Swiss-Prot record:
Entry GO terms, CC: cytosolic small ribosomal subunit
UniProt record, GO biological process: translation
Complex and partners: Part of the 30S ribosomal subunit. Forms a tight heterodimer with protein bS6.
GO terms of molecular function: small ribosomal subunit rRNA binding; structural constituent of ribosome
Protein name from the UniProt record: Small ribosomal subunit protein bS18
Keyword RNA-binding belongs to the record: yes
Lineage, highest ranks first: Bacteria, Pseudomonadati, Pseudomonadota, Betaproteobacteria, Neisseriales
Family that this chain belongs to: Belongs to the bacterial ribosomal protein bS18 family.
Organism of derivation: Laribacter hongkongensis (strain HLHK9)
Record's function text: Binds as a heterodimer with protein bS6 to the central domain of the 16S rRNA, where it helps stabilize the platform of the 30S subunit.
Length: 75
């Protein structure tokens, strides 16, 4: 009894929207790439290109450091 998962086509959101640089101040955009528990969702799940995944990771870490985003979920 193998569980079948819904497969959606993966595409890089940043390439599709024409975003050149990921900004740490765009908290609404960054929240889409963070799981409920506060972890960064990997590129193999989101479909983000490697270049943008690196920028995304750095931007999320900067936003966390500046207290724009939480490190973990709400306890």
């Amino acid at each position: 009894m193998a569980r079948q998962l819904f497969k959606r086509r993966k595409f890089c959101r940043f390439t599709a929207e024409g975003i050149k640089e990921v900004d740490y101040k765009a908290v609404d955009l960054l929240k889409d790439f963070i799981a409920e528990n506060g972890k960064i969702i990997p590129a193999r799940i989101t479909g983000t290109k490697a270049r943008y995944q690196r920028q995304l990771s750095t931007a999320i870490k900067r936003a966390r450091f500046l207290a724009l985003m939480p490190y973990t979920d709400q306890h």
